[in-house]
Amino acid sequence: MAFQKLNRPALLAVCALALAACSNPGPSAPGHGLDRQLAAITSDPVLGMASLSVLSIRGGRVAYQRQFGMRSIDEGLPATPETMYRIASISKLVTTLGVMRLVEQGKLDLDVDVSSYLGFSMRNPAYPEQPISLRMLLSHTSSLRDGGGYSWGVGTSLREAMRDTQGKWDADNRPGAYFAYANLNFGVVGTIMEAVAGERFDRLMQRLVLDPLHLGGGFNPSAMPLEQWRNIATLYRKRAPDAGPWIASSQWIAQVDDYAVRAPVPLAAIDSYKPGANGTVFSPTGGLRISAADLGKIMLMMLDQGRADGKSFLTPASLKVMTMPQWRYQPGRPNGDTYHGLFTQWGLGVQQFESRRGRGSSLVESGGFDAAGHLGEAYGLLSVFAFDAVRRNGMIVLIGGTASDPATTPGRYSALTRQEEAVLTALYASVAP
């Protein structure tokens, strides 16, 4: 992918946007101070971002939403309320909403051996007697691992991919006993969903989740209308897509979704694809494109006990199952990989964050935000979806690329990055009691 050079018109657009961002008040805006604070973070020479889209909810209502930076740097196009992002692993939470809809319809059972859905045996070779369930897959306790890959093309079935077991299983921990975050879990989940519904994953999620909640976007950009795919944010890093040094003072380089002037290309041979063969094709793990505003609709539904627009989308019982911890870290006898303290409790497709100040997954410096949700990171994007169901508060953060390598800018008070900490701590002012 070519370097994205910032020409003079684009540079002028960036400067104009910095001013415009502060003069575009959102719902119940808490004042221009937060606008200026977030604009300064976005344009910081070290922590700076290609684009930023945020939304906060307070007491069950949208309190603040704003966009900063450019969705397409080369074309000089600003991020807008309609701009969609490839939200990375927050997609897993949305995929889980689809799973729970199928559970409520009686098509899936969280505790049945998933082999019965897949049509082939899904077993850890080290523990062949132990069935694997959807509950294990959704809570990352299945013993699946990503070392052998977690995404394959249309021409490869999941059955074929799983025949080579190297790197795909944990030989030391029995399924259900140990947590280790793995994308492959949700590739299997997507395949199961297709198998029981007889429908391609992208279309199934449109029918189960996106259409009922009146959301734009989807898991397949090539199927979107022009007005949607042209508003997908290009994701950037200040390094080549696959290798090379990360230089904060250099040009932004497009990584994925460079659709400002070129339409998304349909997946090769997709018309011959058989649903249930390989759900990884549409990336249930991270491939959803959606705006912060539409993620806000999902969050409001979850804060309203599964109701949206006066109708039931999910039952309160289903949401409780999703958010209730299925796994908790036990320091006395380690039962999971916490990823440097970031993961300590998981439900089904939902993480429980620490509310105490100074803990690994604490989202704000002051502590006190008792939240559940999901994080995401891929191709330069950093994303946060977090809500407090008791106080009915929440925050959504979509960062379209960071000037510095996040690995070199670790957080000061958590296992998050410094970029995420800066935005979350500032945004929390719009939801804090």
Regions found by a protein language model. Give the residues of each.
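C-terminal motif of bacterial Sec signal peptides marking the signal peptidase cleavage site
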Residues: 20-21
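Short, gly/Ser/Thr-rich active-site loops of penicillin-recognizing serine hydrolases
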Residues: 323-335, 355, 365-367, 400-433
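Short, surface-exposed loop or secondary-structure junction motifs
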Residues: 125-369
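Bacterial N-terminal signal peptides that target proteins for export
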Residues: 2-11
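Short, well-ordered beta-strand elements
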Residues: 382-387, 392-408
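Short active-site loop at a secondary-structure junction
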Residues: 45-53, 74-136, 171-184, 283-286, ...
